[in-house]
UniProtKB/Swiss-Prot annotation:
Family: Belongs to the CbiD family.
InterPro entries per the UniProt record, alphabetical: CbiD, CbiD_sf
GO biological process terms, semicolon-separated: anaerobic cobalamin biosynthetic process; methylation
Originating gene: cbiD
Name of this chain's protein: Cobalt-precorrin-5B C(1)-methyltransferase
GO molecular function terms listed in the Swiss-Prot or TrEMBL record: cobalt-precorrin-5B C1-methyltransferase activity
Enzyme class, first EC level, given as a word: transferase
Source organism: Brucella ovis (strain ATCC 25840 / 63/290 / NCTC 10512)
Amino acid sequence: MNDETTPANKNPEKAELRCGWTTGACATAATKAALTALITGEFPDPVGIILPKGEVPYFQLANEGLGEGYAMAGIVKDAGDDPDVTHGATIISTVYPAPPGTGIIFRAGEGVGTVTREGLAIPPGEAAINPVPRRMMTEICEAICAEYGLPADLVITISVPGGEEIAQKTWNPRLGIIGGISILGTTGVVHPFYCSAWIHSIHRGIDVARAAGQKHVLGATGSTSEDAAQALYNLPDFAILDMGDFAGGVLKYLREHPIDRLTIAGGFAKLTKLAQGALDLHSSRSQVDKGFLWQIAERAGAPADMKERILLANTAMEVLELTQSIGIDIAGPIALEARQTALKTLRGAPVEVEIIVTDRKGNILARV
């Protein structure tokens, strides 16, 4: 899970899906509005910002506050049609002057996390506001201050009411980001059902594990297989990667950033797709090949009269149950083939790979 990809609201089958805005873009727009009001006494509404790729979105203000030595503005995040747990959250920026020569200081307010572990893009002790949003806010503040002939010595506090609860639906607690969500985004735009944010979360998890000197990490396709593997190893939270369907996101990053040992745990159907060579295991992007399963079953000793039943089976689990009913093990060969796919993808990187196949109840069917 991660802030901008965990399913929350929409249907991927809908045509012409609408893009939205990242928490970083919302924080930047809120900061621009707050700083403008701090200097002029007036809030721009709507407030426009220039994103890294040149887009110029405008944001309506949901909150305004102007007091002695501070200004505050809030924007409700619209993630478009992306299934995003931060959709509808209010991103608030409070800006006030800092001592001369201080520059721009970022602080985590209510609902924004604080980094506590090495390995992330932001050092421990700092607000979980990622580098691109920091740069966007810094540049816009420097430009506004220069326009009015003022030094850009400011404290910017970003808050998200309810953010601590939202963060429990993300990978932040396992990454060592405590107290709330992260302020994220590299382009400012949320593309519906786009995989980059989720894969970035996987990469952050590997970075944290490496920085902690962790030698063994786990990537699971879901909570059932994760629990089964954890019953064996009891790894620390930060050693559990946010893999889900993105086996390729794990393996390709480990190729360049190796960790000694990787355990991939998953249900039979998901790992059948990995065994077939698929690296994205989502049902809309890869399917179980019943012909492949028949080949596996035939090599394991299944009789010829079972071929048609396997080819006509509705699900991979039905095939598994058919073979189990006559004492044929296909989970073991699937695990071996999945391991070969993983090793091929790693391209010789020094990573030992283990595969654990589970059933729907979390029973281990194969471990190689």
